[in-house]
Amino acid sequence: MEILLLAFALAMDSVALSIASGAKCRTLSFLQVLKTALIFGVFQALMPFLGYILGLSFVNFIQEIDHFIAFGILGFLGAKMILEAHHTKDEPCLINLSSKDLALGAVATSIDALAVGITFSFANVDVTYSCLIIGTVCFVLCTAACYVGKILGAWLEAKALVLGGLILIGLGTKILITHLVDHI
């Protein structure tokens, strides 16, 4: 359940961009939607794995404070998403851009997943399973978001970011409280 909530939260930047693209590109074909969702999903799956590898390189040095780091990273990312929801800007229609431009958008929306991957190195997490769930959830949500964007547009974009931010803050708080309670 936790990994599904995390996957949902991490996908929100990509979902917001997919909603914006759907709202601005009302002539999206099914293949264009799938291409966009696939690129976002693949990057969303790869970034936590890269973060995990990065985190393993220094986990022994920070094992005593890893819960504070996880709380800080998730709290910061959650707050950032909530603030971004109040400062939404017009995004270009990514659908008419090249695969390279879609990949750049996917990297930009999956930086949070890289940071979360670092926290995986501190926890007892099945990284392969988690990354597959994260990528799959992102793919499914982005596919739906392109179509929802055609109907509801910009109104939903900000709501998705707020929800994702609240979930990240909640997960970070849970990690911190669980660790503190376990060490009382």
From Swiss-Prot:
Cellular compartments per GO CC: plasma membrane
Compartment annotation: Cell inner membrane
Transmembrane segments: 39-59, 65-85, 102-122, 132-152, 161-181
The keyword Magnesium is annotated on this UniProt entry: no
GO molecular function: manganese ion transmembrane transporter activity
Keywords assigned by UniProt, alphabetized: Cell inner membrane, Cell membrane, Ion transport, Manganese, Membrane, Transmembrane, Transmembrane helix, Transport
Keyword Transmembrane helix attributed: yes
Membrane topology designation: Multi-pass membrane protein
Protein family (similarity comment): Belongs to the MntP (TC 9.B.29) family.
Function statement: Probably functions as a manganese efflux pump.
Protein name: Putative manganese efflux pump MntP
Species assigned in the record: Campylobacter curvus (strain 525.92)
